[in-house]
Design a protein with these regions (language model features):
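Conserved, structured core segments of small domains
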Residues: 1-106
Length: 106
């Protein structure tokens, strides 16, 4: 089943985010290699197409067997364990995919 995972960054998270990013991306790559990752990405702090530095949070849509597995996976993400995400902002919910773009290019 697909799950929507979202969390907000703490203020001034850039340094912590940069430190935790390689391990965070490795976990996403593992989901991708297993065919379980639909999408993942950060939310820019402000609306600017070239804003790649200042982030306000992240979203992941991935497949897990159940809610508990999705919550456990999210809680073990380096962005959580290294303090990038603000406590109390996590959302992990089941999600039905009713439409998606085929061969989308990001």
């Amino acid at each position: 089943m697909w799950f929507f995972i979202y969390a907000e960054d703490i203020e001034n998270s850039n340094e912590l985010r940069a430190k935790a990013r390689p391990a965070h991306l490795a976990r996403l790559e593992q989901l991708k290699n297993e065919g379980r990752l639909l999408l993942a990405g950060p939310h820019p702090l402000f609306d600017a197409e070239n804003n790649v530095k200042d982030m306000s949070g992240s979203t992941i849509i991935a497949s897990f067997d159940n809610l508990e597995e999705a919550q456990k996976w999210a809680s073990e993400d380096p962005y959580w364990t290294e303090g990038v995400f603000k406590q109390g902002t996590a959302i992990v919910k089941p999600m039905n995919i009713t439409a998606k773009m085929e061969n989308a290019s990001f």
